[in-house]
Each structure stands twice: as structure tokens, then as C-alpha cells.
Amino acid sequence: MAATPKDVRAGQPALDETDRTLLRLLQTDARMPNSELAARAGIAPSTCHGRVRRLTDVGVIRGFFADVDPAAVGRPLRAMVAVSLQAEARGEIRHFVGEIERHDEVIDVFFLAGTDDYLLHVATADTDALRQFVEMLNARREVAGTTTSLVFEHRRGGAPIF
């Protein structure tokens, strides 16, 4: 998993319309060459490069990723695993997350408010591998329980944030 993201909540960076345009374009095609990105945003390539670098440096852009199909790399079974932690384990949340996100099965980790503490998006080779992963979670002393839901289909939202 990626390193701890920059926390942009404390001091929200000011975004102007050009920044929003760049973000919209990059969400559509993160591999777009800088020259094309600049032309489509109506700014000079050097300005474009500087703005993208600034948006990355301040944590607005968290990275540029390949969207890999888990089934194409031998992990066709996807599931959402809701995890509830023991009340006395709340102080170990960062340690728990650090351990869990190192597992190859884990695609995403969501920290929740509500009945469950975490929602894990996982991909495994088969039901046996999923069962082993869930059993490993339940064997951890800080885990009170888990609930697993299989994912039949996943569609990424098509609308950019901006």
C-alpha cells in the first residue's frame, strides 16, 4: 500500500479554476502528456508542470496509478470485509492498519464511523484463500469480529471529483 497520505484537511489548499481543470483532465487520463494537458487546460507547459507538481506536493493529487484488474492477475474473487475492533484495542489502530495493509490481498482500507471500524476491499485467488485471510483477521487479538460480503461486480464511478 502507499505511504501515509499528506493530510490536506488542516490547511485546505486554494484551488482555482485552472487547478480544477487539471484535476478533471488527469482523473480522465492520468497518462496524458504534459504538453497535451497544458493545451487542453489553456496554459503553458511549464505552468502546467508547476501546477501539477504543486498539487502533488500539497497532497491534492495523491499519486498516479495503474488500475489493474485483479482477475487478470490471478485474483478473481473480490470481497468487502467489515472489521470491528475490540474496544480496548482502539489505541492500536495505526499498528493494526499498518499490519493489514501489508497483505497482498488488501486493495483498499476504509476507516469508518458506525458499527464497524474498517472496511477492507480484498481480492483473492479463490474461496479458500479468502477464508484463510478472514480467519487470520479473526485470530488477531484486537479484532472483535468480521463480516464478509462477496463482490459480484465492481464499476468505478465515472464522474471526476471536480
Protein language model features and the residues they cover:
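A compositional/biophysical signature of low hydrophobicity enriched in polar/charged and small residues
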Residues: 1-162
